[in-house]
């Protein structure tokens, strides 16, 4: 893909880049409107998720996470931008006339063919059960529950690795560093999710962040005592505590937040690394 760099005519265009092959004209039968639920508020209007709100209007793209069109070859027709995720999506035209969106695998170009099923080649973009994959395969869009569709490793640049198969389970190393067990009958897609360098992209200005629905993050130490436990003091004052806390007084920065006695506790062999 050709990457075009912006000419530095203003500070906001400095180090900016755009992918020439990525389009933004979705099919009408694969998109639908949705209630704008990204404001970070509940039904009463109370803020439940800070630093969210505003943003450009979005249409949801219907993504095929199940990949259940078995043994039907499809061709990549377009690679498109999706405002609802960091990864790109690509439109697939299947041999039976059906059209679906899937996550764009890294390295896939327009004209490539993909297929899903039980006995398909180990090729980038193909979807098949874990039991049919060799050890060491790089995968994404991994199912946790059989038939529910991919739920793991779906973000831009995400990739997991199949490291072992024993009995009815397969052992995966996830992008977070967590090692866990999953049923061998669950399916996954071969390869890595595309748009790998999205975290290195320069937004250029604060307005670009606001278009994404993200509001400014203010440090608690510069607030007033009524607004945050770290607030108050004259000038640049320390937080006044041994350890930092959240705006509601709970320990922050290091406290484990995972619930105990969770159903998947026995399936996790090694917790994620930070």
From Swiss-Prot:
SUPFAM superfamilies: Nucleic acid-binding proteins (SSF50249), Translation proteins SH3-like domain (SSF50104). The keyword Mitochondrion does not apply. It holds the Pfam family Ribosomal_L2. GO terms for biological process: mitochondrial translation. One of its GO terms (cellular component) is mitochondrial large ribosomal subunit. Belongs to the universal ribosomal protein uL2 family. PANTHER family: LARGE RIBOSOMAL SUBUNIT PROTEIN UL2M (PTHR13691:SF5), RIBOSOMAL PROTEIN L2 (PTHR13691). This is Large ribosomal subunit protein uL2cz/uL2cy. It comes from Capsella bursa-pastoris.
């Amino acid at each position: 893909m050709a990457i075009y760099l912006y000419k530095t005519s203003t500070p906001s265009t400095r180090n900016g880049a755009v992918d020439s092959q990525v389009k933004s004209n979705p099919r009408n039968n694969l998109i639908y409107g949705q209630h704008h639920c990204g404001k970070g508020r509940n039904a009463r209007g109370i803020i439940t998720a800070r630093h969210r709100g505003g943003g450009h209007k979005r249409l949801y793209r219907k993504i095929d996470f199940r990949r259940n069109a078995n043994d039907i070859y499809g061709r990549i027709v377009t690679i498109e931008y999706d405002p609802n995720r960091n990864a790109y999506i690509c439109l697939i035209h299947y041999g039976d006339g059906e059209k679906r969106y899937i996550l764009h695998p890294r390295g896939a170009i327009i004209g490539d063919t993909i297929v899903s099923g039980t006995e398909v080649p180990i090729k980038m973009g193909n979807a098949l059960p874990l039991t049919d994959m060799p050890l060491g395969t790089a995968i994404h869009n991994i199912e946790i529950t059989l038939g529910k569709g991919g739920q793991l490793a779906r973000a831009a640049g995400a990739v997991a690795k199949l490291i072992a198969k024993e009995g009815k389970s397969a052992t995966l190393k996830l992008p977070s560093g967590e090692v866990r067990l999953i049923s061998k009958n669950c399916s996954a897609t071969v390869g890595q999710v595309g748009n790998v360098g999205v975290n290195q992209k320069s937004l250029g200005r604060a307005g670009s962040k606001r278009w994404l629905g993200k509001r400014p993050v203010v440090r608690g130490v510069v607030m007033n005592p009524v607004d945050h436990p770290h607030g108050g003091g004259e000038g640049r004052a320390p937080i006044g505590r041994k350890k930092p806390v959240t705006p509601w007084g709970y320990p922050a920065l290091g406290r484990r937040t995972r619930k105990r006695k969770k159903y998947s506790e026995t399936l996790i062999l090694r917790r994620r690394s930070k």
